[in-house]
UniProtKB/Swiss-Prot annotation, chain A:
Belongs to the ERD2 family. It comes from the Eukaryota. GO terms for biological process: protein retention in ER lumen; protein transport; retrograde vesicle-mediated transport, Golgi to endoplasmic reticulum. PANTHER family: ER LUMEN PROTEIN RETAINING RECEPTOR. The keyword Metal-binding does not apply. One of its GO terms (molecular function) is KDEL sequence binding. The lineage of its organism: Eukaryota, Metazoa, Chordata, Craniata, Vertebrata. It is found in: Golgi apparatus membrane; Cytoplasmic vesicle, COPI-coated vesicle membrane; Endoplasmic reticulum membrane; Endoplasmic reticulum-Golgi intermediate compartment membrane. It holds the Pfam family ER_lumen_recept. It comes from Xenopus laevis. The record marks D193 as: Important for recycling of cargo proteins with the sequence motif K-D-E-L from the Golgi to the endoplasmic reticulum. It is a multi-pass membrane protein. This is ER lumen protein-retaining receptor 1-B.
Length: 212, 10
């Protein structure tokens, strides 16, 4: 464990909690892409199948449980509890264009051709593009609530910090995982546009609005 | 290079 990875995990956990609280407190999921949250639930499910078979540490197991439980809770709130506030007309990204290519790629490029390893690889590839429906929805509505932009910023920063974690681990642990690094780079690049808007607007107290 | 199955990151 190193500071970048720890801060990354904290940032990721913060994003998940921010979203849960935003929906629960405001009793509304307006502006939130249910499709992205569905994809995140798939990402955690396919990545943590070894939750009960491969114990690494208490921290690792407890964080995995929190991630899986909160992602399912978020999906449940969007598609069931507060589905009346779900803005389906603006959440129109074709997720099959994300799931199919990443599934095919996980069969072609992986560390080991075994079910668990292919599912782990699929989850890494899917995570790198899972935010696209949400970013697409923000660009379609032309704006995002400030709390939603804080959620997106925390979520984007988590994988950016993981990039520094991989530099650290390559330097000091001779560890590198090209699949995770390349997917992490793609994931971070997808946030660049949003990071620019967040830093130039939201941090100056303005509302996040995209040129429609 | 990481060995398959020993993914210790979240």
């Amino acid at each position: 464990m190193n500071i970048f990875r720890f801060l990354g995990d904290i940032s990721h956990l913060s994003a998940i909690i921010i979203l849960l609280l935003k929906i629960w407190k405001s009793r509304s999921c307006a502006g939130i892409s249910g499709k992205s949250q569905l994809l995140f639930a798939i990402v955690f499910t396919t990545r943590y199948l070894d939750l009960f078979t491969n114990f690494i540490s208490f921290y690792n197991t407890s964080m995995k449980v929190v991630y899986v439980a909160s992602s399912y809770a978020t999906v449940w709130m969007i598609y069931s509890k507060f589905k009346a506030t779900y803005d389906g007309n603006h959440d129109t990204f074709r997720v099959e264009f994300l799931i199919v290519p990443t599934a095919i790629l996980s069969f072609l490029v992986n560390h080991d051709f075994t079910p668990l390893e292919i599912l782990w690889t699929f989850s890494i590839y899917l995570e790198s593009v899972a935010i696209l429906p949400q970013l697409f929805m923000v660009s379609k509505t032309g704006e995002a609530e400030t709390i939603t932009s804080h959620y997106l910023f925390a979520l984007g920063i988590y994988r950016t910090l993981y990039l520094f974690n991989w530099i650290w681990r390559y330097q000091f642990e001779e560890f590198f995982d090209l699949i995770a690094i390349v997917a992490g780079l793609v994931q971070t690049v997808l946030y660049c546009d949003f990071f620019y808007l967040y830093i130039t607007k939201v941090l100056k107290g303005k509302k996040l609005s995209l040129p429609a | 290079e990481v060995l398959p199955g020993d993914h210790d990151e979240l």
